[in-house]
């Protein structure tokens, strides 16, 4: 089941989210928008299980990475209205 993984331009290129992901959904790609000259990318969102470990690992005040669970997942967890 695929979830939406959104990476914002507040990414500081620290690699914490990449290292936290148990399924290697994320990887770092070149980007000139921060000192690290890299940012997270999510090329394999079809493998995302929605554990949100990447969100938990993100050290920025505004989470630079967010996982939006699919509607099927939110229904099964009783989170939908």
Curated annotation (Swiss-Prot):
Cellular compartments per GO CC: chloroplast thylakoid membrane; photosystem I
InterPro entries: 4Fe4S_Fe-S-bd, 4Fe4S_Fe_S_CS, PSI_iron-sulfur_center, PSI_PsaC
Binding site for [4Fe-4S] cluster 2: 21, 48, 51, 54
TM spans (from-to): none
Keyword tags: 4Fe-4S, Chloroplast, Electron transport, Iron, Iron-sulfur, Membrane, Metal-binding, Oxidoreductase, Photosynthesis, Photosystem I, Plastid, Repeat, Thylakoid, Transport
Gene3D superfamilies (UniProt xref): 3.30.70.20
Function: Apoprotein for the two 4Fe-4S centers FA and FB of photosystem I (PSI); essential for photochemical activity. FB is the terminal electron acceptor of PSI, donating electrons to ferredoxin. The C-terminus interacts with PsaA/B/D and helps assemble the protein into the PSI complex. Required for binding of PsaD and PsaE to PSI. PSI is a plastocyanin/cytochrome c6-ferredoxin oxidoreductase, converting photonic excitation into a charge separation, which transfers an electron from the donor P700 chlorophyll pair to the spectroscopically characterized acceptors A0, A1, FX, FA and FB in turn.
Annotated protein name in UniProt: Photosystem I iron-sulfur center
Species whose genome carries this gene: Tetradesmus obliquus
Gene that encodes the chain: psaC
């Amino acid at each position: 089941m695929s979830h939406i993984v959104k990476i914002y331009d507040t990414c500081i290129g620290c690699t914490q989210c990449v290292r936290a992901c148990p399924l290697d959904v994320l990887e770092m790609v070149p980007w000139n928008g921060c000192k690290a000259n890299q940012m997270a990318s999510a090329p394999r969102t079809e493998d995302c299980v929605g554990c949100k470990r990447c969100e938990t690992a993100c050290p920025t005040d505004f989470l630079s990475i967010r996982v939006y669970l699919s509607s099927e997942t939110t229904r099964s967890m009783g989170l939908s209205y």
